[in-house]
Amino acid sequence: MSGLSRALQLTDIDDFITPSQMCIKPVKIDKAKSKTGAKIMIKDDSCFEESESGKKKLNKVEITLQDCLACSGCITSAEGVLITQQSQEELLRVLQENLTKKATEDWGNVRTIVFTIATQPLLSLAHRYQIGVEDSARHLAGYFRSLGADYVLSTKVADDIALLECRQEFVERYRENENLTMLSSSCPGWVCYAEKTHGNFILPYISTTRSPQQIMGVLVKHVFAEKLNVPASQIYHVTVMPCYDKKLEASREDFFSTANNSRDVDCVITSVEVEQLLSESQRTLAQYDPVDLDWPWSNVPPDFMVWAHEKTLSGGYAEHIFKFAAKELFNEVPRSELEFKQLKNRDFREIILKKNGNTVLKFAIANGFRNIQNLVHKLKRGKVSNYHFVEVMACPSGCINGGAQIRPTTGQHVRELTRKLEELYHNLPQSDPENSLTKLIYTDFLDGFQTEKSYELLHTRYHDVVSELSKSLNINW
């Protein structure tokens, strides 16, 4: 298991969603079907035997990342799979190999190393090392530069674009009364669960807008590569994320470009993995020289590199889209800070806009697997069709409490840690997605807003894994 990230091996990695203990890999077995399925005994040598009608030695099972994506045995426990290309060991290997090629002047094989850092890991690292959030970004950039990074970026522009695309998609669906309730798509744990468990029933409701990570992948491998005049395959793009499931998302075939022979995101490391790397370096984050983050999208960078998007903690989808839709569809301007009403628990909240006594917009935020299950079951029974949009995140409290965020210190409760991270987030400057820098990317690189090119690069599709599984034998390990 040397290829598995050490952070995944050594910690409790349930990422707040209770995984099924039944991993299913479709294996064709020529035997009669039974009502109970085949029982498998795992042996010490990692082989297993089928023991229903006499013992039968089977081959060793090798589970790749693609097997995991095509499987519905677990829900989101990507972290339990051997993801050899998504570990800090692999990252360090690539960085060292690249430094060696530079030292030997093997310029034809030198890769451009680009890091992209999401906001939530910066909050986690800032709290862990007791420094400011913007400072944590600059010190982290310095650390990555010391490892051999050529560029270090923030996800700000991708966060902005994701909101612009998602809100426009919602307004179009609302006007056409098509595929509502619309469900957010930025959480890979939620998308993986939907594909594996509910298939074609739920998939049309999910927004086609790519997550900020994958939008950033497009910008780096298409836009930035063009600016640098290097092939996309020659760029090694690393993202720093709050969630192990982002590793699975980056590995989807939808995000591999056959034209460029390159993935949009080559490697994902997480907050807790960065902490582990820093621990192994025997230095704290603040001990690395601070370096400004790069801003390759225009000549003038923004005043800050780390921004909040509304007051909600997972990208601000529900809040931002609600405000935009109220103005765009009904010429209503809600208060700058919306108040969501808590329902059965703090992770399920809703907000309503009424006009002439009628409810014209009804949005919700559903965080945590329990609320996701309830939401889907109600959708199937037709009981939540009055919700127009739901922001769905797999982790309780959303991405700020992601399964790969740095763990609480001894004696500190998860709720207390989450509250402190929320305070850090709420003190960040607020980003307006309709800023001139974002508009510049649309005009200069995407042929404008709502163009064929922008849709091709900024949207994705989903797959009914359930129907594929119905063709295979259900095996309990």
Curated annotation (Swiss-Prot):
Keyword Ligase: no
GO molecular function, one term: 4 iron, 4 sulfur cluster binding
Binding site for [4Fe-4S] cluster 2: C187, C243, C395, C399
GO BP: iron-sulfur cluster assembly
SMART domains xrefs: Fe_hyd_SSU
Gene3D superfamilies in the cross-refs: 3.40.50.1780, Fe-only Hydrogenase (Larger Subunit), Chain L, domain 3 (3.40.950.10)
InterPro entries: Cytosolic_Fe-S_CAF (IPR050340), Fe_hydrogenase (IPR009016), Fe_hydrogenase_lsu_C (IPR004108), Fe_hydrogenase_ssu (IPR003149)
Keywords tagged on the record: 4Fe-4S, Iron, Iron-sulfur, Metal-binding
UniProt keyword annotation of Lipid biosynthesis present: no
Residues where [4Fe-4S] cluster 1 binds: C23, C68, C71, C74
Job of this protein: Component of the cytosolic iron-sulfur (Fe/S) protein assembly machinery. Required for maturation of extramitochondrial Fe/S proteins.
PANTHER family, alphabetized: NITRATE, FORMATE, IRON DEHYDROGENASE
Stated family: Belongs to the NARF family.
Protein name stated in the entry: Probable cytosolic Fe-S cluster assembly factor GG21400
Organism, as annotated: Drosophila erecta (Fruit fly)
